[in-house]
């Protein structure tokens, strides 16, 4: 019985091997967000929806197996539009899905991002990359991460997390300059964001 209880209490330690979000703003991004806060506050909600083009990049094994399907990408796009339409923001696919068949990147290491994305990014759109798994440049397994303005127009996603109905919305929120509710750090320490 004691062994069973020990296993029961140790299970949660091993059950959380992946952090949800790998997005941590740089000081430059924090300064930019602070400087542009008033412009964002004054954005007129009565305007036509803000249309944001998306280029979806699905990374698969070299033999074309794995990766998200067209139906999966449709789910992601519908999820984004459902969550953001009340903020007068609408997303659309600017081109067909870019399938990247390369087993070297199927399980993604954030240290390879600059080289890999330089070959695939499309300018002036949000590039969303879907990998089998994502390890951030700090070595943590994450569901995804994005860049605050004025960073790269890019979101990196673990494919399974992209389909959970919330992580892609969360990461696009960072792209749109939203902090975590606990402030600009990715720790449990809270920074007060309300005056």
Segments the model singles out, each with a brief description of its role:
Residues 118, 132-151:
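Catalytic zinc-binding patch centered on the HExxH motif and its immediate surroundings
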Residues 18-126, 130-134:
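Propeptide-to-catalytic entry region of secreted or membrane-anchored zinc metalloproteases
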Residues 74-77, 154, 169:
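Extracytoplasmic/secreted envelope proteins and their assembly/folding machinery
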Residues 161-195:
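The catalytic-center signature of Zn2+-dependent metalloproteases
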Residues 151-161:
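Glycine-rich adenosyl-nucleotide cofactor-binding module
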Residues 3-17:
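Sec-dependent N-terminal signal peptides
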